[in-house]
Amino acid sequence: MLLSSMAKHDPNLDRIFQALSDPTRRAMLARIGKGALPVSELARPTGMALPTILRHLSVLEGAQLITTEKQGRTRMCAARPEILAATEGWLAAQRALWEARTDRLEALLQTLTEKDG
């Protein structure tokens, strides 16, 4: 079982979850998800230095959660919702797997209880 799940290892999924592990990046992604924003607008509410913001954006872009594009002197950031949708698919598959396992365990416990009763 472990080997089969390792064979299906997806490094893109690892990058996505690593990017989402930071609350600052999640907040930035939530804001970008409402519409493309310039880097300066993303930096304003955080109080963080621009190099720190750029590192966070680099992680989000590396995970393909956002795209950035230079428009004149402004760098715009836009979300890629299809990447999150793929992540939701993986989570749904995991949820179904674990629900099936707990259903089987519940059925086994019910059978054992009936035998003892």
What residues fall within each predicted segment?
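Amphipathic alpha-helical dimerization/coiled-coil segments
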Residues: 1-12, 30, 85-117
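Acidic-residue sensor for enzyme active/binding pockets
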Residues: 41, 61, 106
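N-terminal helix-turn-helix DNA-binding core of bacterial DNA-binding proteins
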Residues: 7, 11-52, 74-85, 89
